[in-house]
């Protein structure tokens, strides 16, 4: 679970390496973000020459969390790091062209099909 001021690694090739969560979207007082939730964030660390620059405000979807997420069958899924993919402001398509590392199956249920199709592995 991620909240305001959480630092998250970026799992795509948009140019950003790390983002800081500003706000969790959805609901009037939603405090924490899990897998598949959209957040507004600022880029804290970026690669030179990338499409995303430092201090830019972006939207991102959470694709991996350290906190275990419970699935309907009773199993849990957890990852070694917190990671997000930067998406376009007007739709749910990623700004990068590649996704690094596995993503959770919950993204398919939340209609992030482009991210699921680009990911090397869906767990």
UniProtKB/Swiss-Prot annotation:
CDD domains: Ribosomal_uL14. GO terms for biological process: translation. GO terms for molecular function: large ribosomal subunit rRNA binding; structural constituent of ribosome. The keyword Ribosomal protein applies. Keywords: Ribonucleoprotein, Ribosomal protein, RNA-binding, rRNA-binding. The keyword Ribosomal protein applies. Part of the 50S ribosomal subunit. Forms a cluster with proteins L3 and L19. In the 70S ribosome, L14 and L19 interact and together make contacts with the 16S rRNA in bridges B5 and B8. HAMAP family: Ribosomal_uL14. Belongs to the universal ribosomal protein uL14 family. PANTHER family: 50S/60S RIBOSOMAL PROTEIN L14/L23, LARGE RIBOSOMAL SUBUNIT PROTEIN UL14M. Binds to 23S rRNA. Forms part of two intersubunit bridges in the 70S ribosome. This is Large ribosomal subunit protein uL14. It comes from Corynebacterium urealyticum (strain ATCC 43042 / DSM 7109). The gene is rplN.
């Amino acid at each position: 679970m991620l909240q305001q001021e959480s630092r998250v690694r970026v799992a795509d090739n948009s140019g950003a390496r790390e983002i800081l969560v500003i706000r969790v979207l959805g609901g009037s007082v939603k405090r924490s973000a899990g897998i598949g939730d959209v957040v507004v964030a600022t880029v804290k660390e970026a690669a030179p020459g990338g499409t995303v620059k430092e201090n830019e405000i972006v939207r991102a979807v959470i694709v991996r969390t350290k906190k275990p997420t419970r699935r309907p069958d009773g199993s849990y899924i957890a990852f070694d790091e917190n990671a997000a993919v930067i998406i376009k402001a007007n739709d749910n398509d990623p700004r990068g062209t590649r996704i690094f590392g596995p993503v959770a199956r919950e993204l398919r249920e939340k209609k992030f099909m482009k991210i699921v199709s680009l990911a090397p592995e869906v767990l």
